[in-house]
Structure formats: C-alpha cells, structure tokens
C-alpha cells in the first residue's frame, strides 16, 4: 500500500527536493491528509505527472497551479507571470503610499487604485484584501491573462466576496496604458501601481531558461525614447499617469535596477514630486515612487 509518507519520500528522491515533493502531494491530496493515509493509484499517477513536468524544466509554480502571494493563494499558469517577492514589496510600498495619500481626498469615498497590466491579479486583489474601502481597477492587454485574473477574483470571492466585488477588471492595450479606464477617473485616481514589462529584447535572450516559459509580452518592452533598455512601458506609464492622479496621488512602478536614473530624470521633467526609488530585499533599485 502506498501511503502519503512513502509517496513523498519517493518523490523527494526523484526531484532531489523534499519541499517540492511535499507541495506537490499537498496540491493533490490537500494539507490535512495524515502521513500514513493510503493513497489511490490515481493520486500516485497525478503526482508522477507533476514530477515529470517539473523534471522537464517547467517552473514549480505552474506545475502546482497555485502560488501564495502575501495573504492570498492564487491560480498561476503559463498565461501569466509568476508572482514574485519583489512584487510583494511593490504592494507593500503601494499600501504605504495609499495610507499617506487617501486622507487628502475631499469626498467621503474610499481610495481609487489602478493596477495596470494586472496579470494574475496579484497586486489588485492584495490591495483590495488589505484596504477595506478601496476600489481597484485592474487592466491587462492580454485576454488570457485577464481570464486568470477573473479566476483569482472568483477564488478570493468564494471566501471574501466583499474583496472580489471591489476589483473591476478591464481589457486594455499595449499602446494606451490608461485607455481601458473610465474617462471619469481621469484626475481622480489615488494610486497607479504596475509591474510592467521592463526587460529589453536583448536581455530576454540571456534570461534563465525557466523565464522563457513565462509570457514574453509581460516581460519584454521596447527601449525608452532616451535609449534606456526595456524602458518604454515604464516611460508610457509615467508620461500618461500624471494626469490620471489626484493632486498628491502616487505612482508606484516596479523597474529594472538600471532604469532608476532614467525614471527619476523623466519623473522630474514631468513634474512629479517626492520622487524616490526603493530597493528590493536583495538591495537592488526596484520600486519607483512619485507623487503628482
């Protein structure tokens, strides 16, 4: 008889990772199954198929089909980028800016946030889950990615419907980053937050192979008008974003380390105030912040 314990042990040896083995078994069996719980042939086959995919080089998050991001468990598959710790830090910075900005609103409504290029919905849903009265407009230019965001909104909504109903999904495009938003929001957004494509086409070639399995359109951007590699999307958000923010509203953008100088320079020219770049957990310039 195959038990959960023996299945995990066999899988750990095959994957050379006890942690990944445990996660795969938990994904199929659930976390509450006892160590000596007898498992069916169907479970053994399902776990073996996951191991095959992992050994073929597929990212662990796609193999599992779910991944934790801050307080949420999200559906993740090859239609969207894998949520990363750097982006959790982006949310942390965004929440801090929102706490500082929102009290300046003249009306009694809660803060309004735009998450551009939402992908899995990780940023939008996290902000909605952690700020009680916020409305988050989440856009993406990729229909498949937006479908994953909708799945995750439903997933969160199954236990926290009040969170899901405050996230509005909109189909956008790569040319006009703000075009999917209702025109009535222009000049009225408290926070624009985004993890846009910021890898240049040349840089993409040299990325580790597993990153090539993630959607290229969510990673790769043209160079900026000043020649900064991969900067075009960040530049577009900064150029257009100023007019969409309320006075005192913030823009928070995940960037590549080498784009910090270009982002600061452009933001200064566009009239942003309190411009800074925060470092990620590895000490790299990663999160651009500015106020209207």
What are these regions (language model features)?
Residues 1-16, 42, 99-110, 158-166, ...:
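Short, low-complexity, intrinsically disordered N-terminal peptides in bacterial proteins
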Residues 49-150, 171, 177-180, 289:
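SAM-dependent Rossmann-like transferase core, predominantly class I methyltransferases
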